[in-house]
């Protein structure tokens, strides 16, 4: 029997933005997440419905409510179709920390926060091209279902849109 592992989720200080180690973690995976400069990262943290980390830079999650001041084609896709939602903008786990349940712990906390804020669903996009099979499997295991598809020529990606009902 495997013992449950607990992680301390730490809310980011909205006045400080992303600490340098988290910014570096994000930018290490810029192809999947998109590159962030310190100013853009600070704006995202201020606007987020949930901005949290595990450890100094073990994992990061940023998610936005539908009324956030956030310009992003994927976020806009959801805003045009759903009334109330939490949009997962980015989640990243440091390579050395993968497979330990950090992403699942972040999502579990997000689902609880979304329910507490009376949101009906949590949404996200997953790259189809370039493919991200690990993300596909992870989101399927959490009950996400595909609700749309888009080609993003400026980003050089094709994405699928997913939703998970809350409550």
Positions of PLM-derived features:
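Conserved active-site alpha-helix within GNAT-family acetyltransferase domains
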Residues: 128-148
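Short beta-strand micro-motifs in enzyme catalytic cores
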Residues: 50-52, 84, 158-162
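Conserved beta-hairpin
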Residues: 48-65
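Conserved acetyl-CoA-binding loop-helix of GNAT-fold acetyltransferases
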Residues: 93, 99-112, 141
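Conserved GNAT acetyl-CoA-binding A-motif
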Residues: 114-128
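C-terminal "cap" of GNAT-fold acetyltransferases
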Residues: 149-167
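Conserved acyl-donor/pantetheine-binding loop and adjacent beta-alpha core of acyl/acetyltransferases
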Residues: 62-90
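Short amphipathic alpha-helix that is part of the acyltransferase structural core
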Residues: 2-39, 55-58
């Amino acid at each position: 029997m495997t013992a449950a592992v607990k992680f301390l989720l730490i809310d980011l200080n909205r006045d400080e933005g992303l600490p340098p180690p988290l910014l570096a973690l994000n930018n290490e995976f810029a192809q999947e997440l998109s590159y962030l400069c310190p100013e853009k990262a600070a704006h995202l943290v201020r606007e987020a419905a949930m901005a949290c980390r595990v450890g100094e830079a073990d994992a990061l999650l940023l998610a936005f409510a539908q009324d956030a001041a956030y310009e992003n084609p994927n976020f806009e896709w959801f805003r045009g179709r759903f009334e109330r939602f939490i949009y997962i903008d980015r989640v990243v786990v440091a390579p050395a920390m993968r497979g330990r349940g950090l992403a699942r712990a972040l999502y579990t906390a997000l689902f609880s926060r979304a329910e507490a804020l009376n949101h009906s669903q949590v949404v996200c996009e997953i790259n189809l091209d370039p493919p991200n099979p690990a993300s596909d499997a992870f989101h399927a295991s959490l009950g996400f279902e595909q609700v749309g598809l888009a080609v993003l020529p400026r980003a050089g990606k094709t994405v699928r849109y997913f939703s998970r009902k809350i409550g």
